[in-house]
């Protein structure tokens, strides 16, 4: 797998990992074990180590996920096969999301009130008299018909948020259309003077350069800028409606409302957090690359400056 990612033959990767496992440092391997690694340089060895560490982290995460789902009695052979087959951390977490232990959510509170059957009826979008059907759920902690419908919508919203196809669709919208927006925190204008270029900034995320991302994130961490990443909300809602809303009746109107709530309250913030982390990683990687190149040039320059 590492060989495919880095384009380095498996034999060289195995030898490198063996040396790292014995405690050899990257500079030592690069300089004194060229015959074992096939002449890999420090950057290549570092990349091998980094990818190996990531895969080890994913393997440990899989063990935790499999154990948790198994304890719930919900681990089927098909689910176990899917989890074992994926090495994409985002996909892994999407698979796990419906089984992930949650603090008491609005959906869980609604389930405890006995409203999951109503949510299932609404999702089918076939019930001709939803109001009358909802009235049959008014008992115990369910105060009235609207309370029943609201609880059912909360359950549907959570289902939409946990749907892998929906999450990937919104990720795709973020990838293609998301804009990063920065605004100065009110009252911080003077303190944030060096970030003036970003006081009212908006640009396509995929076109935003690494040095801009780095500056924006630095200012955000200093409490000087408010930063958000957002796609075209209407396009996202239309995409979700195509997946979940069928027909034009009382049930479909309720599902449409639940889908909009899922996007605004759950899905969008979750995917925005993912893309914020990715943009920070991109900026950090570029900063390290620039620093490394500058240091290399410095070390290669004559000790007393250029000869005249």
Regions found by a protein language model. Give the residues of each.
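Acidic, Mg2+-coordinating catalytic module of metal-dependent nucleases/exonucleases
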Residues: 13, 48-51
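Duplex nucleic acid-engaging cores and interfaces of nucleic-acid transaction enzymes
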Residues: 28, 44-47, 54, 58-68, ...
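N-terminal cofactor/phosphate-binding cores enriched in small/glycine residues
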Residues: 8-43
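C-terminal interaction appendages of subunits in large macromolecular complexes
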Residues: 1-12, 63
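Helix-turn-helix-type domain boundary/helix-start signal
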Residues: 4-6, 38, 73
């Amino acid at each position: 797998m590492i060989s495919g990612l880095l384009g380095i033959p498996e034999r060289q990767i195995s030898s490198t990992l063996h040396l790292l496992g014995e405690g050899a440092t990257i500079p030592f391997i690069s300089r004194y074990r060229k015959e074992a690694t096939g002449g890999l340089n420090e950057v290549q060895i570092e990349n091998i180590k980094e990818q190996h560490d990531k895969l080890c982290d994913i393997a440990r995460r899989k063990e935790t996920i499999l154990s948790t789902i198994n304890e719930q009695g919900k681990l089927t052979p098909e689910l176990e096969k899917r989890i074992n087959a994926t090495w994409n951390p985002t996909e892994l977490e999407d698979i796990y999301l419906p089984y992930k232990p949650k603090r008491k959510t609005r959906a869980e509170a609604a389930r405890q009130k006995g409203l999951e059957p109503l949510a299932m009826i609404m999702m089918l979008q076939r019930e001709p008299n939803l109001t009358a059907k909802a009235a049959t759920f008014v008992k115990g902690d369910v105060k009235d018909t609207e309370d029943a419908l609201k609880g059912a919508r909360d359950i549907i919203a959570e289902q939409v948020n946990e749907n892998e196809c929906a999450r990937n669709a919104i990720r795709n919208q973020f990838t293609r259309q998301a804009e990063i927006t920065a605004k100065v925190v009110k009252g911080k204008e003077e303190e944030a003077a060096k970030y003036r270029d970003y006081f009212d900034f908006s640009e396509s995320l995929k076109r935003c350069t690494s040095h801009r991302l780095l500056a924006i994130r630095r200012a955000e961490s200093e409490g000087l800028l408010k930063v958000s990443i957002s796609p075209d909300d209407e396009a996202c809602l239309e995409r979700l409606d195509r997946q979940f809303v069928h027909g034009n009746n009382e049930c479909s109107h309720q599902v449409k409302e639940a889908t909009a709530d899922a996007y605004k309250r759950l899905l969008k913030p979750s995917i925005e957090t993912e893309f914020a982390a990715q943009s920070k990683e991109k900026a950090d990687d570029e900063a390290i690359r620039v620093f490394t190149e500058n240091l290399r040039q410095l070390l290669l320059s004559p000790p007393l400056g250029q000869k005249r």
